[in-house]
Amino acid sequence: MQIIDNINKTVKDDLKAGIHKGSKVSVAAACFSIYAYQELKKQLEGIDELRFIFTSPTFVTEKASKAQREFYIPRISRESSLYGTEFEVKLRNELTQKAIAKECADWIKRKAVFKSNVTQEQMMGFMTVDESTYAPISGFTTVDLGCERGNNAYYTVMKTESFENANHYIKLFE
């Protein structure tokens, strides 16, 4: 087991070293950002597939009745994080968003499958790359990869390298 503190060693650096041609990546997280894709673009181009589960209902048709909407919190923030979270504003202002979005969309069509947790059950975020497991992972963003600080006092991620551990998490996708 390894502890990644996202200061001295980042999840991004570890993923750059750990993702190889033919790797299979599975992610359960609250959001997906094109800027996180950009940080790992070279490595992600070589993978066989990415399976992603949004841990909260995202990009799904709402079925809530009008009476339940009295305390409704809009899901727009989860879905808009696709184009960057509040901590990725600096990158967004480089006017490269359209190009990154097109590259990411093309990659998603070729390599990725996205699903959403539509149950009322909580899901913990995690990521597996072949036999390595990273947990907890909140979102697939530059903050979670350790590229940006965000508003976290700390963001420690545990990495385990065991077929049994990774297989347990991978089975959650089936």
How should these model regions be labeled?
Residues 1-174:
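PLD/PLD-like phosphodiesterase catalytic module centered on the HKD motif
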